[in-house]
């Protein structure tokens, strides 16, 4: 999966998030830092480069607003917008993962060669802290992260409450995008070093940037925004099959 981020004066003109070798992505930053913009960019990239046969989506939208525009897409396997349905969706994702491993065992192959399944969780901390969902959500997300890679199952988790994400969960996310954080400690929790707290504030400075964490350290990128009319065009294309034929 390729995310086209511009690196101002940096060494990269394009950010390539390798979801094959680093299958899970954690996006973290304070309120208004650009998490929704980042997720929209990822989903836009997937919708523009893959078909529903190649990419399946499970969307967990506890705010009931950030991901609702996508729920009618043919790519979407399941959409959940509260705690109980979120747990059902995570459990279904795990069952799909286990079924894929059973299929690989029957066919004597080591890597699943079917569609990619992306489990996108908006405000993952809510699931991991609420008493009604905490224990089961932690168990399911951790298990998905541990075994998802070989089955082409990917978890994309977003949060503004970085310290509340257990270390046992965080350590499974090798792919990380750090947006502006409240303080240096939050920056260290997401990208192992301070710096994200000093990123421009998109609300007051009208400029959004992020750090993408690489094996050699964090790299600074501009955060692109998919225009509303462009996203509407892509959503319209996939939700009106007749227009695809035309």
Where are these regions (language model features)?
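Phosphate-handling catalytic cores of nucleic-acid transaction enzymes
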Residues: 246
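P-loop NTPase catalytic phosphate-binding loop
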Residues: 1-185, 191-193, 198-202, 211-216, ...
């Amino acid at each position: 999966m390729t995310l086209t981020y511009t690196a101002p004066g940096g060494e990269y003109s394009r950010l390539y998030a390798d979801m094959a070798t680093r299958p899970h992505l954690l996006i973290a930053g304070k309120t208004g830092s650009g998490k929704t913009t980042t997720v929209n960019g990822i989903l836009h990239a997937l919708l523009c480069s893959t078909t529903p046969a190649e990419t399946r989506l499970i969307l967990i939208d506890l705010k009931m607003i950030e991901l609702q525009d996508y729920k009618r897409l043919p790519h979407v396997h399941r959409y959940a917008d509260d705690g109980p349905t979120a747990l059902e969706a995570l459990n279904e994702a795990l069952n799909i993962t286990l079924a894929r491993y059973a299929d690989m065992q029957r066919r004597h192959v080591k890597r699943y060669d079917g569609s990619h399944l992306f489990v996108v969780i908006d405000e993952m901390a809510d699931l991991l802290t609420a008493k009604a969902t905490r224990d089961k959500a932690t168990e399911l997300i951790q298990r998905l992260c541990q075994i998802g890679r070989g089955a082409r199952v990917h978890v994309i988790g977003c949060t503004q409450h970085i310290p509340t994400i257990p270390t046992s969960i965080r350590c499974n996310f090798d792919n990380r995008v750090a947006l502006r954080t409240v303080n240096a400690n939050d920056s260290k929790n997401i990208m192992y070093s301070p710096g994200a707290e000093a990123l421009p504030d998109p609300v007051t400075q009208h400029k959004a940037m992020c750090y993408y964490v690489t094996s050699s350290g964090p790299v600074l990128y501009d955060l692109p925004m998919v225009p509303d009319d462009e996203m509407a065009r892509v959503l319209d294309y996939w939700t009106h099959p007749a227009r695809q034929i035309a």
